[in-house]
Swiss-Prot record:
PANTHER family: CARBAMOYL-PHOSPHATE SYNTHASE SMALL CHAIN, MULTIFUNCTIONAL TRYPTOPHAN BIOSYNTHESIS PROTEIN-RELATED
UniProt protein name: Carbamoyl phosphate synthase small chain
PROSITE patterns noted in UniProt: GATASE_TYPE_1
HAMAP family for the chain: CPSase_S_chain (MF_01209)
Source organism per UniProt: Brucella suis (strain ATCC 23445 / NCTC 10510)
The EC number(s) this enzyme carries: 6.3.5.5
Signal peptide: none
Record family assignment: Belongs to the CarA family.
Subunit structure: Composed of two chains; the small (or glutamine) chain promotes the hydrolysis of glutamine to ammonia, which is used by the large (or ammonia) chain to synthesize carbamoyl phosphate. Tetramer of heterodimers (alpha,beta)4.
Pathway(s) the chain acts in: Amino-acid biosynthesis; L-arginine biosynthesis; carbamoyl phosphate from bicarbonate: step 1/1; Pyrimidine metabolism; UMP biosynthesis via de novo pathway; (S)-dihydroorotate from bicarbonate: step 1/3
Positions annotated to bind L-glutamine: S60, G257, G259, L287, Q290, N328, G330, F331
NCBIfam families: CPSaseIIsmall, PRK12838.1
Enzymatic reactions: hydrogencarbonate + L-glutamine + 2 ATP + H2O = carbamoyl phosphate + L-glutamate + 2 ADP + phosphate + 2 H(+)
Any one GO molecular-function label of the UniProt entry: ATP binding
Length: 407
């Protein structure tokens, strides 16, 4: 009998097929996934454990590369129902993604394809196999980083050229990205929130009419409005106050979106200022919140690293309660700049930054976080009922209980 010695495959070093090049010249190598090519963007980190498809398709992430701090990715696959941008063909949202581990094979009854294939279809360049904790710590210490992410299956990179691109990119300040992600023409949104029994239904008996200005709106925001009985007419970001009022709305919604609020505000702030004076109930989220503050005489500023995640504690001064919310913003309202007739209603318990405001004596309010998201409990869904109640009050109707869930 011949003895055989068990053989152990030697360690292999995978060839780099993707790189992240920071503006300071730092090069991080790893495995490329998703689309190929190279793109400049701002690198941020997101602390959410779930919802990667919703995160990557959120138009507020336009011009950004998302580092996922949770190590596992791809376990629920991807589908066409969980995207957040209004026009999937235009692929608005994050341009890059960074993962600790390789993509996991999907195991979910709603999965239509694996994450790698989905990234390719969306045109998102991804980098895996790096120390995301170290990158997150770097961003925490130095701030959000301008960078280039590149993917070449052959591993051929001109690092000097990529370093130059990263160093010369202008960054998000002074960039109006809302014009790139907004719809081209108006539309009426009727889709209702998803249920296990029926999927997405359709609103067929609206009680109110809300006009939404689309600076990069998420689908689930619109669904929660229709779920409360609203017909929602969505208008492009460049719509004027006259355009909005021509639809005779019961309420006006200012959506989330990407980029610098001061840049988008060049055309949006005058519109918002006129709408505030009409007495029509007005509700803003994220970028809409920031531009409302500008219209009221406040200021906004670029944040060091921004807030991106689903575990952010926010205090609502109007109720005294603390909510765990989803956030995605790199600019913030300067609380000290708000005029006397504007009250701060919400504040971040992480760093004390402004997260909400209301105008004294007017049916106008806004929040920085995303109340449509549900990181566990639906802590902030009451804000949609608060908006609808302002509409009902103007119509002489009794208010809905805020404590009930909106979806």
């Amino acid at each position: 009998m011949t003895e055989t010695t068990p053989k152990t495959a030697p360690w292999t070093v995978q060839k780099r097929t993707a790189v992240l090049v920071l503006a300071d010249g730092t090069v991080i190598e790893g495995k490329g996934l998703g689309a190929t090519g190279a793109v400049e963007a701002e690198v941020v980190f997101n602390t959410a454990l779930t919802g990667y498809e919703e995160i990557l398709t959120d138009p507020s992430y336009a011009g950004q590369i998302v580092t996922f701090t949770f190590p596992h990715i791809g376990n629920v696959g991807a589908n066409a129902e969980d995207i957040e941008d209004l026009t999937p063909a235009n692929r608005h949202g994050a341009v890059g993604a960074i993962f600790k581990a390789d993509i996991t094979a999907p195991s979910n009854f709603r999965a239509a394809e694996d994450l790698d294939s989905w990234l390719k279809h969306r045109g998102i360049i991804a980098l895996a196999g790096i120390d995301t904790r170290a990158l997150t710590a770097l961003i925490r210490e130095r701030g959000a980083q301008n960078a280039v992410i590149a993917h070449d299956p052959n591993g051929n990179f001109d690092l000097d050229a990529l370093k130059a691109r990263a160093a010369n990119w202008c960054g998000l300040e002074n960039l109006d990205l809302a014009k790139d992600v907004t719809i081209g023409q108006s539309l009426v949104w009727k889709e209702l929130p998803w249920t296990l029994q029926d999927g997405y239904g359709e609103q067929d008996a609206p009680q109110y009419h809300v006009v939404a200005l689309d600076f990069g709106v998420k689908r689930n925001i619109l669904r929660l409005l229709t779920g409360l009985g609203a017909k929602v007419t969505v208008l492009p970001a460049t719509a004027t106050a006259e355009d909005v009022l021509a639809h005779n709305p019961d309420g006006v919604f200012l959506s989330n979106g990407p980029g610098d609020p001061a840049a988008t505000g060049e055309y949006a702030v005058p519109t918002i200022g006129k709408l505030v004076e009409t007495g029509i109930p007005l509700f803003g989220i994220c970028l809409g919140h920031q531009m409302l503050a500008l219209a009221l005489g406040g200021r906004t500023e670029k944040m060091h690293q921004g807030h991106h995640g689903a575990n952010h504690p926010v205090k609502d001064y109007t109720t005294g309660k603390v909510e765990i919310v989803s956030m995605n913003h790199g600019f913030a309202v300067d609380s000290d700049s708000l005029p006397e007739n504007v009250e701060e209603t919400h504040v971040s318990l992480f760093d004390g930054t402004n997260c909400g405001l209301r105008v004294v004596g007017k049916p106008v309010f806004s929040v920085q976080h995303h109340p449509e998201a549900s990181p566990g409990p639906q802590d902030s869904h009451y804000l949609f009922r608060r908006f609808i109640n302002l509409i009902r009050e103007r119509k002489g109707q009794a208010p809905l209980p805020e404590s009930e869930q909106a979806a």
